[in-house]
């Protein structure tokens, strides 16, 4: 009986060797979508260096991903000493990669408001109405609200 138990334990151990050799799979590399989610959290908490790290990794991993460039634009617009020229470049790249990217239209419009160009923001609002098919999508509502606040502050 003792020999049988020893054999059983040995067989179970040997059966798990490939899994042990593969290492701990719980430490896998984050996907670009996960990096963008993390970057947004870091931006929201003003952890600019971590946001920049995640975005740098994301753009290296998927250089043709419109969501990556949209988030880069958001980062460059929101960080201290906003870099609007870089934000415009990022948003325009997102729209080049995906002309129907609604968030890029919204955020580019908000960047134009920061640059005191409300007419450009209103053009993007009109684009959003077409892309959304109505005035009820979140991106349209957010940009419309930002334009209204901008005009009220004038």
What do these predicted regions represent?
Residues 58, 93-94, 127-128:
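Canonical positions in the second alpha-helix
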Residues 45-53, 80-93, 116-124:
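Structural signature of tandem alpha-helical TPR/SEL1-like repeats
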Residues 30-60:
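Alpha-helical segment of the N-proximal tetratricopeptide repeat
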Residues 71-72, 107, 143-146:
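Canonical tetratricopeptide repeat
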Residues 32, 66-67, 102-103, 136:
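Helix-start (N-cap) detector for alpha-helical repeat units in TPR-like alpha-solenoids
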Residues 7, 20-33, 122-154:
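Terminal, low-structured helical/coil segments at or just beyond the last alpha-helical repeat
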């Amino acid at each position: 009986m003792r020999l049988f138990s020893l054999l059983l334990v040995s067989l179970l151990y040997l059966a798990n060797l490939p899994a042990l050799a593969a290492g701990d799979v719980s430490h896998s590399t984050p996907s670009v979508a996960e990096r963008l989610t993390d970057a947004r959290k870091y931006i929201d908490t003003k952890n600019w260096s971590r946001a920049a790290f995640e975005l740098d990794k994301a753009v290296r991993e998927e250089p043709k991903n419109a969501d990556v460039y949209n988030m880069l634009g958001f980062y460059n617009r929101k960080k201290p000493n906003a870099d609007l020229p870089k934000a415009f470049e990022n948003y325009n790249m997102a729209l080049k990669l995906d002309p129907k990217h609604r968030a890029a239209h919204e955020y580019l419009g908000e960047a134009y408001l920061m640059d005191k160009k409300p007419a450009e923001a209103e053009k993007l609002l009109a684009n959003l109405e077409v892309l959304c098919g109505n005035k009820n999508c979140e991106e349209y509502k957010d940009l419309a609200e930002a334009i209204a606040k901008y005009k009220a502050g004038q």
